[in-house]
């Protein structure tokens, strides 16, 4: 952890809503005049798309579980190194994973390369004179044998829907965006399950703040293609670790007054309508980030 070069980490599985948090942070950074060094979690995967398929096929042939959720498919060492070096110096290295033809064209023009979607760009230095590091991905607080990213994050945010909702989103979006059948996606869920249990879920016991979306419609059977519950058909439980609540001085009466229809379910949790999730994030996170930057300025 570092007051001079803070690390903010948002962790959650694919489709969990981390993009909503990312947008909230973007608004905060713009309003506060903050320049972040932004790092995407999938750029620290171990394999490019083709190599990942080969590694997965080899693991399946051996009867082994292998997925992007686990350590064997990721460079936790490089990510931990980035968090550590940034906290010490404000520097480090990052790269990009190319998701689309458009992204590939953008970065090929920068590097003079001919990379395709599914490949990584070369490693490059973090831009100089950034105010903080912002990570968004699967493993922002992962802890295991030989690595501990949690201890290096100054603020760790978890974004995790209730598991039936997560599966509904995964199955339905894979069908709509990739043409996968429900059965094919269920096979993926089953293959990933050991890594999900051992490497994704434990992070949410270590976060400073968790945002958990809970649907208010029937999601009893998530294993078929169906309509994804809308934000207004959901609640979001916002849980604060006691240490984080005390450290950041979370003002619950203020939040209850500002967020219509919100209520406290426990002394450390507030519940809001799903449609208010982004607004709640900005109310909660703006003073935290502001204080981080003020602390940074006080020792610079």
Give residue spans per PLM region.
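C-terminal accessory "lid"/substrate-recognition subdomains
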Residues: 115-128, 132, 149, 163-300
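Phosphate-binding P-loop
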Residues: 1-5
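Post-Walker A alpha-helix
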Residues: 21-22, 26
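Conserved nucleotide-sensing/catalytic segment adjacent to the nucleotide-binding pocket
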Residues: 34-40, 44-109
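Conserved lysine of the Walker
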Residues: 18
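P-loop (Walker A) phosphate-binding loop of NTP-binding proteins
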Residues: 12-13
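Conserved ATPase-coupling elements of RecA-like P-loop NTPase cores
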Residues: 142-147
